[in-house]
Amino acid sequence: MENKFTPFIGIEYIKFGSDRSDVNISINSDSEVFTRNEIAENSTDYYKDLGFFVEYDSNNKCEAIEFTKDSGLLYEGRNLFDLSYSKLRTIYDSISNEMEEEDKLGCTYHDLGFAVSKSTEDDNIESVLIFSKNYWR
């Protein structure tokens, strides 16, 4: 499934700020609930069959969605997983005014609303995180 995303808004059927119960209803698929790390404000829902994770803030509102290479994510007509990491950087580094490289593991485009994790073994994209305006604050 290819998911079209709009920066700081979400995808067609999951909008940032949506309540967890509304997200679960709109997805209508089984999820695994777990806590990602010790600094997480809330648990995360992993939809393995769909290839993405949904993160929630302390008020159970959707604040980010992380897509794995098992899913599709369209931005401006491009499936980001069809691009190599270096090609993605060539395209979006020239557009973004707020790109932050993260220890050669990936980068975040704060002004475009997404972050990319790359493989340490090759130039492939491992995951893409799309986020709400307040996610990094």
Give names to the regions the model predicted:
Residues 1-137:
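Short helix/turn-capping signatures at newly exposed starts of structured segments
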